[in-house]
Amino acid sequence: MPGPTQTLSPNGENNNDIIQDNGTIIPFRKHTVRGERSYSWGMAVNVYSTSITQETMSRHDIIAWVNDIVSLNYTKVEQLCSGAAYCQFMDMLFPGCISLKKVKFQAKLEHEYIHNFKLLQASFKRMNVDKVIPVEKLVKGRFQDNLDFIQWFKKFYDANYDGKEYDPVEARQGQDAIPPPDPGEQIFNLPKKSHHANSPTAGAAKSSPAAKPGSTPSRPSSAKRASSSGSASRSDKDLETQVIQLNEQVHSLKLALEGVEKERDFYFGKLREIELLCQEHGQENDDLVQRLMEVLYASDEQEGQTEEPEVEEQTHDQQPQQQEEY
């Protein structure tokens, strides 16, 4: 039996977790050299309170705290949407529970943010953290969603940090942790070209010969040149606006395509796992397994053919009934 100051792990063995007088469990962690995989973790201390108290930090203070602890250069709460900071926090609290080599510290796109949050979810599951991560909300980069989550994570950090030294730059092996772009900024900031240098009137002015000293242009010709230069400048602005809009559409379509491809690969992996399970239990002659295999391997044509006999059976059943009525 464990001593009065120790607890049992979920599997029942003595894991040397220490219980303070107030009942708080301090997880036991084995001091090991970084890079080893023989870590011994206790359960993480779960935090459920999300109410605002005097200890709740302002958005400026909490960003300063994040930058100080894990050596980042974030300027806004919204930049936490990449998930990279949380991954490094988990490595700090529970060394080895997450592989920082897989974390995208220079993430700039939404699917890269989702990748980081999946790593965070895996570390939460490994450490028995009950918190549900609202990934879909966080990756959008909205202020309130990210503020609520970092406020909770600060309390989770305070409940689990044991005061050990930690070098965040060395832990991520010198990876440049570039802050993600501000979600409010425009993605495409094309340099504005000088209208005077690129306008047709500028080229015409250069190619036109010098006016003779004795000649004076008439008023109608000067009015025509003024109107043509004004229309040319307006057309340049319209073209630049169209280019910016088209670039934004192309970028949004690329993001949508990447998201669809990622979702396709995700569900294909699930189907592959189901297929392997069915193959493992296929020799048991289970009707459910056989039915699942038929569904997995059925093509569109086969599914259409399976529906046709049912229709024919219904028509055959209706004919005897009609004959009996007569």
UniProtKB/Swiss-Prot annotation:
Positions of the region APC-binding? 258-301
Question: Which GO MF terms does the UniProt record name?
Answer: identical protein binding; microtubule binding; microtubule plus-end binding; protein kinase binding
Q: What is its main location?
A: cytoplasm
Q: Which GO terms describe its biological process?
A: cell division; positive regulation of ARF protein signal transduction; positive regulation of focal adhesion disassembly; positive regulation of keratinocyte migration; protein localization to microtubule; regulation of microtubule polymerization or depolymerization; spindle assembly
Its keywords, alphabetically, are:
Cell cycle, Cell division, Cytoplasm, Cytoskeleton, Microtubule, Mitosis, Phosphoprotein, Ubl conjugation
**Which parts of the sequence are annotated with region: DCTN1-binding?**
186-326
Q: Where is this region: Disordered?
A: 170-239, 297-326
The Acidic residues compositionally biased stretches are 300-312
Annotated InterPro entries: CH_dom (IPR001715), CH_dom_sf (IPR036872), EB1_C (IPR004953), EB1_C_sf (IPR036133), MAPRE (IPR027328)
User: Which family is this protein grouped under?
Assistant: Belongs to the MAPRE family.
Function as written in the Swiss-Prot or TrEMBL entry: Adapter protein that is involved in microtubule polymerization, and spindle function by stabilizing microtubules and anchoring them at centrosomes. Therefore, ensures mitotic progression and genome stability. Acts as a central regulator of microtubule reorganization in apico-basal epithelial differentiation. Plays a role during oocyte meiosis by regulating microtubule dynamics. Participates in neurite growth by interacting with plexin B3/PLXNB3 and microtubule reorganization during apico-basal epithelial differentiation.
Q: Spell out the subunit comment.
A: Interacts with DCTN1. Interacts with APC (via C-terminal). Interacts with monomeric and polymerized tubulin. Interacts with SLAIN1. Interacts (via the N-terminal region) with BAG1. Interacts with ASB14. Interacts with HAX1; this interaction is essential for epidermal cell migration.
Protein name from the UniProt record: Microtubule-associated protein RP/EB family member 2
Organism the protein comes from? Rattus norvegicus
Gene that encodes the chain: Mapre2
